[in-house]
């Protein structure tokens, strides 16, 4: 096992290598607007997972995934050559869901803000359902009650 710091540094290096390869060396027309967002490497340095995002439709995302799968061997050999590892890690490409999740959270926050504004607008004109002063004053003592106690 390798320490986590070395695995993290190698993962960053793999991310840069893959991004550079996609930008300069791989000329597949199926590759759309691809951004390599992250790379993770297991502590035994055997498996690398590269996360990417694609700007475009679902068909473009599928075409980009196919292009990355077909270029995986070339990318892996370049990673092995440039990192100098004894065993070149296997590379798995995974589409990054973080931008979609962030967009969904922003939509939920916008809905919550709108609902809060509606509640505040309704509360500004609202009056209490009962008396304006909900606390009751003590009842005045009846004279008849005192007479009953004396008997």
Curated annotation (Swiss-Prot):
Its main location: cytoplasm. InterPro entries: KH_dom-like_a/b, RbfA, RbfA_dom_sf, Ribosome-bd_factorA_CS. GO terms for cellular component: cytosol. GO terms for molecular function: ribosomal small subunit binding. Residues 142-151 have a biased composition (Acidic residues). It comes from the Bacteria. It is found in: Cytoplasm. One of its GO terms (biological process) is maturation of SSU-rRNA. Keywords: Cytoplasm, Ribosome biogenesis. The keyword Cytoplasm applies. Residues 120-129 have a biased composition (Low complexity). Residues 116-151 are annotated as: Disordered. NCBIfam families: rbfA. One of several proteins that assist in the late maturation steps of the functional core of the 30S ribosomal subunit. Associates with free 30S ribosomal subunits (but not with 30S subunits that are part of 70S ribosomes or polysomes). Required for efficient processing of 16S rRNA. May interact with the 5'-terminal helix region of 16S rRNA. Belongs to the RbfA family. Monomer. Binds 30S ribosomal subunits, but not 50S ribosomal subunits or 70S ribosomes. PANTHER family: RIBOSOME-BINDING FACTOR A, CHLOROPLASTIC-RELATED. This is Ribosome-binding factor A. It comes from Thermobifida fusca (strain YX). The lineage of its organism: Bacteria, Bacillati, Actinomycetota, Actinomycetes, Streptosporangiales.
């Amino acid at each position: 096992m390798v320490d986590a710091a070395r695995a993290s540094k190698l993962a960053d290096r793999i991310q840069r290598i893959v991004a550079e390869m996609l930008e300069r060396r791989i000329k597949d027309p199926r590759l759309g607007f691809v951004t390599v967002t992250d790379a993770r490497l297991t502590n035994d340095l055997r498996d690398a997972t590269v996360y990417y995002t694609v700007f475009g439709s679902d068909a473009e995302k599928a075409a980009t995934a196919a292009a990355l799968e077909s270029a995986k061997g070339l990318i892996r050999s370049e990673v092995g050559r440039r990192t100098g590892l004894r065993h070149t890690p296997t590379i798995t490409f995974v589409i990054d869901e973080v931008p979609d999740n962030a967009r969904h959270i922003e939509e939920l926050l916008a809905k919550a803000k709108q609902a809060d504004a509606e509640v505040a607008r309704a509360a500004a004109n609202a009056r209490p359902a009962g008396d304006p002063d909900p606390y009751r004053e003590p009842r005045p003592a009846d004279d008849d009650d005192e007479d009953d106690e004396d008997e």
